[in-house]
């Protein structure tokens, strides 16, 4: 089967379920790719553009609105997963701790997880919480792809400069981490991220 033939139809994505606790997750079968990022980094917008379905993942001007793990089925066996946003100071610490425990359990125990897309606003990349999430995923041997979102907010030269700086910062992790520029506004990097997702989905268990 060719890569094209095996690529999921992202436009077929449909909301499946949400989970506030680990035991509420759907069966650990098939293949999942999860998206995670700081609140308002553009995670929901990225999911909407990748699938071509406006409003699939709810966007909000209020950071911290996504408080559960949301699952979107591409077909019977493949899913995209929207993990809770992090790093929003106005969310009570108790709530943040619950999110952290839920996400940690998901990353550590979810056997069908094929890869993690870490979404960062290109104007504020690699905050301490971003680095913590990357360390999490690296420790659990999860492939990581970084989206530097909102690249349209910077000039082309400035965006490339930031891309290079982040590449240098993550180089110690080796081939487990890849990154790219992305913009939900002008669709920069859309084909590139879809290619990464499709490669992960087609990888052996």
From Swiss-Prot:
Residues of the signal peptide: none
GO BP field: division septum assembly
Domain EngB-type G: 29-203
GO CC list: cytosol
GTP-binding as UniProt keyword: yes
Coiled-coil regions listed: none
Cofactors, names only: Mg(2+)
Keywords from the named record: Cell cycle, Cell division, GTP-binding, Magnesium, Metal-binding, Nucleotide-binding, Septation
Residues reported to bind GTP: 37-44, 64-68, 82-85, 149-152, 182-184
Alphabetized GO MF terms: GTP binding; metal ion binding
Annotated family: Belongs to the TRAFAC class TrmE-Era-EngA-EngB-Septin-like GTPase superfamily. EngB GTPase family.
Name of the protein this chain belongs to: Probable GTP-binding protein EngB
Native source species: Coxiella burnetii (strain CbuK_Q154) (Coxiella burnetii (strain Q154))
């Amino acid at each position: 089967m060719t890569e094209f033939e095996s690529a999921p139809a992202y436009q077929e994505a449909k909301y499946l379920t949400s989970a506030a606790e680990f035991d509420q997750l759907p069966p650990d079968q098939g293949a999942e790719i999860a998206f995670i990022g700081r609140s308002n980094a553009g995670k929901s917008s990225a999911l909407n553009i990748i699938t071509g379905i406006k409003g699939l993942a709810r966007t909000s001007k209020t950071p911290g609105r996504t408080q559960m793990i949301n699952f979107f089925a591409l077909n019977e066996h493949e899913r995209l997963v929207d993990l809770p946003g992090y790093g929003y100071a106005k969310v009570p610490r108790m709530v943040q701790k619950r999110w952290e425990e839920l996400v940690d359990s998901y990353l550590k125990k979810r056997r069908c997880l094929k890869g993690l897309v870490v979404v960062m606003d290109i104007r504020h990349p690699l905050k301490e919480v971003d680095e913590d999430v990357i360390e999490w995923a690296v420790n659990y041997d999860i492939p990581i792809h970084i989206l530097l979102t909102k690249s349209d907010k910077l000039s082309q030269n400035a965006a490339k400069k930031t891309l290079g700086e982040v590449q240098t910062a993550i180089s110690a992790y080796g081939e487990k981490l890849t990154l790219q520029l992305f913009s939900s506004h002008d669709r920069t990097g859309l084909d590139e991220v879809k290619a990464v997702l499709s490669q992960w989905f087609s990888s052996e268990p």
